[in-house]
Every structure is written in C-alpha cells, then in structure tokens.
Amino acid sequence: RVQHVLAKHLGIRRVRAVIGGSLGGMQVLEWALMYPEIVRSIMPIGTAAGHSPWCIGLNEIAREAITNDPDWRGGDYYGKGQPERGLSLARQVAMMSYRSDVSFLSRFGRDRRRPEEKRTEERFDSANLFQVESYLHYQGMKLVQRFDANSYLYISRAMDLHDVAFGRGEMPGVLSSIRCPALCIGISSDILYPVHEQRELAKGLGAATYAEIDSPHGHDAFLIEYDQLTRIVKGFMKDHGL
C-alpha cells in the first residue's frame, strides 16, 4: 500500500512490469492482486505465494538466536547496545540458506584460515579454523554494524505470515485470478524457494511462463547472475510488447 501511495504521488498511473526477488517477489504478487488496473505484467523471482515450513523453520532458528541473546532485553535494548551475538548468528544461519553446498565447496572447500599451521597443533576448540567459519563470522558481524535486530525479527515474521490467499479464498482461485502476463523465475540451486515451487507458482497463475537461472550460487543467484537474468527479462518483455 505504501508503494502504491508513492507511485500515485509520483504520478505513475501504469506499471509496465513489477519485478522482485524473495520478499520483493511476495510484494510483486500482492501488486497484481491489489492493483490489477495498474500492473501490466509481473516477474516474481525465487519467491512464494505462501512461505513453506522449511523457510519458516529457518527463520524461527534465526529469531531464537536473537531473542535468546541476553542483550535483546525483550526488544528494549535501545541506548544499551543491541544483541550483537544473536543478530550475528541469525545472519550466519541466513547466509547458509542463501547459498548452496556446491557454491561453498567451490569457494571454500576444507581450506583453513591459516594453511601454514600444522595440523598437529590444532585443538578441538579451535575457533575460526576453516575459511568458511571465518567467512560466516565476518558476514554476521558485518550485518550487526548496519541492521537492527528488531527489524530482523519483524521482517522475517512478515515473510512467514505472507499468504496471498489470506482473506481472499482458496489459493488456486486466488492465483488464477491474476490475469496479467507473468514470468516466474526459479534458480536451479535455490534451497529456500526450490524450482519445483516456482514451477507450481507459474502453473497456478492465470497467464504465466517459467524460466530458470542456472547457477550454483543458490538463492542469491538473482543478485549475482546478472547476464542470465537480463536475458530472461528482456526476452519476456519483448515477447509481450512491454
């Protein structure tokens, strides 16, 4: 609704294509349902009409990491320092789900952070022994510097509660009511929104086609494989005179 208000304020009366991935893809579907008179086409990427139990479960683990950090203080941590350990761990869990086993194997393998160290010097409790561990810890602390823990909780819960059928009827009927041209884009190695879900979404929409990004980079591929995504989007827009 806020996006629609902004569009009206800017004098935008028609939208040629609403495109978005992940949470953005959920908003794409809502645009088509809430403002069909404005939207000419949609392109949801690696998303869902309703969050799967797999995604909900991963989000819950991340939220538990935050709320079990003593520094969370029931959400009232402002002025006292936010729950850095919990938010960092939540981010690390998320990073694992954004990529794939193939991408991690290719990037890190079993490489050690300090390859010059002798293996006989290792201890069971060694921290940051492997490069992948160091990478995850870095990504976790990087998010802590620029993101609010409570925002993480609410955004992840909003994704879990997302359900285009809520208040509208049964899912098949709701999806089929979207009549504008649609392009559903899946990612071959996405473990959050696997390709079978994307094909089902395309099948359920009234006038949709399906395309797939072939990549080892998991869910994040739509932020990495620009050439493939550009080719897919351009082809769809050309085919539909957009």
Residue ranges with predicted function:
Residues G167-M171, C180, I191-K203:
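Short alpha-helix in the alpha/beta-hydrolase fold that links the catalytic acid
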Residues I178, C184-G186:
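Short beta-strand/loop motif that positions the catalytic acidic residue
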Residues Y138-Q139, Y154-V174:
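Active-site nucleophile elbow and catalytic-triad environment of alpha/beta-hydrolase enzymes
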Residues P44-K142:
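Alpha/beta-hydrolase-fold enzymes
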Residues R1-A17, M26-L29, P36:
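Conserved acidic catalytic loop of the alpha/beta-hydrolase fold
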Residues R199-A202, A207-L242:
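Catalytic active-site module of serine/aspartate enzymes centered on a nucleophile-bearing elbow/loop
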Residues A17-S22, I187:
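Conserved alpha/beta-hydrolase "nucleophile elbow" surrounding the catalytic nucleophile
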